[in-house]
């Protein structure tokens, strides 16, 4: 009897166990299946010998240093605004973008320089499309002064040249920009031109590249049929709208007549002719941007590495002043950054959602326009520092204490004397203000003191003795005298107090004399009386001679009338000492005043035409008569439902001489016609 073998367990590791190896031929067959070729074998083209198609050129671009001659190739020039192209007979040097070129000289080039205007001007092989053949049919050149017939079919509408003023003739042979523009436009003409293009969908869009070279021809294409070209700017180019308007007028030759946000209205000129326009060659491809200096340095000038690191850490904790939207209008961004620098030395702008290149272009523009120093572009934010040599753009405060203190620079004994005189006058003014706020003064005593004030020991002096006050308050250094009338200005209230008739030599000490001083000092003019006196004075303009006692007499008269009529309440010193009594009397006095305004002398409207009836009344009477003559309506109540139902009584006979308008039915109208 055969017994089964017991399974033996191996104590070797899997790497030490021996496995049978297959032959090499079998291994190849299992791992790699041999498949016949499906198609003919493709042959590679022979590699060209031109450097433009080499592997190095197709890979990572090498930095080509710029020669010292400033002309790397024929017609190509490296300037402080990038790379420019110069052609014979051109009015200016061409650039790919006239507004978005960085204001820095390139450090190196990324490709060999060439002229991007076509095969004739390009030293490299032509890689673009084959140019279209010229048309055999010679089309007449478009002339703006020779318009097509108005009823001709298949012709787009064309605006005529102009507008021309009365007596003005068009200039056909206009060459210069001033001759093409003609006379300046009036406000009515500008509003009419803008209104005609405001809702037009035919516009030129300007994006992150700004005003490019090929847009010049597009603007002339718009001017071919319309007087105004509407340009809509969005994105990075809107930061410096003034530069865009300047470049448009300089390169194209028109006139910006209106600008609102990112929309520009460019007028072609009164004598513009499309046939005599300047023709520019088109750029057939975009040149590669050169290498510019780094925008952000690790350690900005004037800082240590630790200070720069601490400033970046502190700047990332600041809230951003604004968030820029994609394809938005950033015309106010420069002013916002400048205002923010008035409050803090670091400013952060949120650029989340924008392209990385747009964020860096915005930072480069702010660096030149604000100006400022860029610290970081991390976390899609622009972090800026105002710099160590920053100066505030706000004007200094003229009324501040520091400015006044700087202006008051005196020397020697003269300064001490001036300060003494000014101190005396200021003490008098403080005494006047304290006396005016004194509550306890009697009406009879005030009248007596006013009558006797001319005989008191207060001798009035001119303002010649106190010139220091005029110097310290910033008033003109001309010293007024008592003979010259004082000029009053609401912006300079010190002139009211410093009347030549109000300056005192001695300061009274008792209470009665202080009240007299108060009454005498209240002769300051108010705006209404001064205006009335200016109108009466025909000899002088802007000067007013102050009267002494007219205003105080009128004030006392009004106060006396108020007391007699019960509209004013006078309390004695004993009554003022008790606060409860003052409260009770004030409450009782408040309740005694009528709640509504009482007008004693009210004007009554006199009816000049009493016998003539009013037109409105006649119209209303006529409407009432028509309503009475209309068909009556009876309200019948349903007992079950309880709701009212309106029914018309048709059994009533109509009057034969009354014709109702819009109230007859068909059967009733037939009865009347029969």
Swiss-Prot record:
Signal peptide: none
Region (CRS2 binding): 554-576
Single Gene Ontology MF annotation: RNA binding
Subcellular location: Plastid, Chloroplast stroma
One protein family per Pfam: CRS1_YhbY
Family matches, as SUPFAM superfamilies: YhbY-like
Residue ranges annotated for the CRM domain, each copy included: 183-279, 301-397
PANTHER family according to UniProt: CRS2-ASSOCIATED FACTOR 1, CHLOROPLASTIC
Record-given protein name: CRS2-associated factor 1, chloroplastic
Lineage: Eukaryota, Viridiplantae, Streptophyta, Embryophyta, Tracheophyta
Gene that encodes the chain: CAF1
């Amino acid at each position: 009897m055969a017994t089964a073998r017991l399974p033996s367990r191996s104590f070797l590791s899997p790497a030490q166990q021996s496995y049978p190896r297959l032959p090499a031929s079998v291994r190849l067959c299992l791992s790699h299946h041999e498949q016949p070729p499906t198609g003919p074998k493709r042959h590679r083209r022979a590699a060209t010998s031109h450097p433009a198609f080499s592997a190095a050129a197709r890979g990572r671009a090498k930095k080509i240093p710029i020669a010292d001659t400033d002309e790397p190739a024929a017609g190509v020039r490296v300037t402080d605004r990038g790379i420019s192209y110069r052609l014979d007979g051109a009015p200016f040097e061409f650039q790919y973008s006239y507004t978005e070129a960085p204001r820095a000289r390139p450090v190196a080039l990324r490709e060999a320089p060439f002229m991007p205007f076509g095969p004739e001007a390009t030293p490299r092989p032509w890689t673009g499309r084959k140019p279209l053949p010229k048309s055999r049919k010679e089309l007449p050149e478009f002339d703006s002064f020779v318009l097509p017939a108005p009823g001709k079919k298949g012709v787009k509408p064309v605006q005529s040249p102009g507008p021309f003023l009365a007596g003005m003739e068009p200039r056909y042979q206009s060459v210069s920009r001033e001759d093409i523009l003609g006379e300046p436009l009036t406000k009515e003409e500008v509003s009419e031109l803008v209104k005609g293009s405001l809702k037009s969908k035919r516009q030129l869009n300007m994006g992150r590249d700004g005003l490019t070279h090929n847009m010049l021809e597009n603007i002339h294409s718009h001017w071919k049929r319309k007087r105004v070209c509407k340009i809509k700017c969005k994105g990075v180019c809107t930061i410096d709208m003034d530069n865009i308007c300047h470049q448009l007028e300089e390169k194209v030759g028109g006139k910006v007549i209106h600008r609102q946000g990112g929309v520009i209205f460019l007028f072609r000129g009164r004598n513009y002719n499309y046939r005599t326009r300047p023709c520019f060659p088109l750029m057939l491809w975009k040149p590669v941007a050169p290498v510019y200096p780094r925008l952000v340095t690790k350690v900005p000038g004037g800082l240590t590495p630790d200070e720069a690191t601490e400033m970046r850490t502190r700047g990332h904790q600041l809230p951003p002043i604004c968030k820029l939207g994609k394809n938005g209008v950033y015309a106010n961004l420069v002013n916002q950054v400048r205002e923010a620098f008035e409050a803090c030395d670091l400013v952060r702008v949120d650029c989340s959602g924008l392209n990385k290149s747009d964020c860096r272009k915005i930072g480069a523009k702010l660096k030149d326009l604000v100006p400022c120093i860029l610290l970081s572009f991390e976390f899609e934010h622009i972090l800026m520092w105002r710099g160590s040599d920053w100066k505030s753009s706000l004007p200094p405060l003229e009324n501040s204490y520091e400015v006044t203190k700087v202006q008051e620079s005196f020397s020697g004994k003269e300064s001490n004397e001036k300060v003494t005189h000014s101190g005396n006058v200021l003490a008098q003014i403080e005494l006047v203000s304290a006396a005016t706020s004194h509550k306890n003064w009697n009406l009879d005593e005030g009248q007596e003191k006013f009558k006797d004030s001319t005989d008191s020991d207060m001798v009035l002096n001119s303002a010649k003795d106190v010139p220091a006050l005029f110097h310290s308050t910033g008033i003109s250094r001309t010293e007024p005298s008592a003979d010259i009338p004082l000029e009053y200005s609401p912006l300079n209230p010190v002139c009211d107090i410093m009347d030549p008739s109000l300056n005192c030599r001695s300061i009274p000490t008792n209470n009665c004399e202080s009240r007299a001083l108060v009454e005498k000092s209240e002769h300051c003019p108010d705006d209404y009386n001064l205006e009335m006196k200016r109108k009466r004075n025909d000899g002088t303009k802007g000067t007013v001679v102050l009267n002494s006692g007219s205003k105080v007499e009128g004030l006392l008269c009004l106060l006396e009338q108020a007391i007699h009529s019960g509209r004013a309440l006078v309390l004695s010193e004993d009554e003022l000492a008790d606060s409860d009594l003052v409260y009770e009397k004030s409450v009782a006095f408040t309740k005694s005043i009528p709640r509504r305004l009482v007008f004693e002398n009210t004007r009554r409207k006199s009816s000049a035409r009493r016998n003539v009836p009013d037109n409105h009344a006649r119209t209303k009477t006529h409407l009432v008569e028509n309503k009475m003559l209309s068909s009556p309506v009876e309200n019948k109540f349903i007992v079950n439902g309880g709701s009212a139902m309106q029914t018309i009584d048709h059994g009533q006979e109509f009057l034969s001489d009354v014709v109702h308008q819009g109230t007859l039915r068909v059967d009733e109208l037939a009865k009347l016609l029969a």
